[in-house]
């Protein structure tokens, strides 16, 4: 069960990374970063509410900005989003993810990739991988602000 929760946290982290584009919100055909996630076959719920800005480059590299760092609790795990996240997004794959981590026991572990396989999302961290049903991420969670995490 702990692995299931870790995967959920990893998925949320991956979503956040997927949100960026070379296109800024004002010039993007997508009005929100959440719509952009759906273009790449990811549910909007892998990214928390409150994204302030995003950018996506032609090569799939992206950046996402929140008002500040925040944490959510998912299935017994705590997931931390930094104020700025980045990675690379392709259809059904977010890799090179930075700025999202999960607390495993007493240690924070970076989530580095999220993959979609059918109706499952697979979250990858350095020490663990976990899969969750895509339908568990239909809505974006609210994030609890963490002042000590810089934007």
Q: Predicted segment positions?
A:
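Helix-rich interaction surfaces within compact, conserved domain-sized segments
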Residues: 81-151
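Cleavable N-terminal signal peptides of Sec/SRP-targeted secreted and luminal proteins
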Residues: 3-21
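Plant P/S/T-rich low-complexity glycomodules
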Residues: 20-33, 145-151
């Amino acid at each position: 069960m702990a692995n299931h929760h870790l995967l959920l946290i990893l998925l949320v982290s991956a979503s956040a990374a997927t949100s960026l584009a070379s296109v800024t919100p004002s010039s993007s055909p997508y009005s929100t970063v959440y719509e952009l996630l759906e273009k790449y076959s990811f549910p909007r719920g892998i990214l928390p509410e409150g994204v302030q800005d995003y950018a996506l480059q032609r090569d799939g590299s992206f950046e996402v900005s929140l008002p500040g760092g925040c944490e959510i609790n998912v299935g017994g795990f705590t997931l931390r989003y930094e104020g700025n996240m980045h990675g690379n997004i392709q259809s059904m794959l977010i890799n090179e993810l930075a700025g999202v981590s999960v607390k495993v026991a007493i240690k924070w572990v970076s989530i580095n990739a999220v993959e979609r396989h059918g109706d499952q999302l697979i979250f990858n961290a350095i020490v663990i991988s976990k899969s969750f049903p895509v339908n568990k991420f239909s809505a974006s969670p609210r994030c609890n602000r963490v002042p000590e995490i810089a934007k």
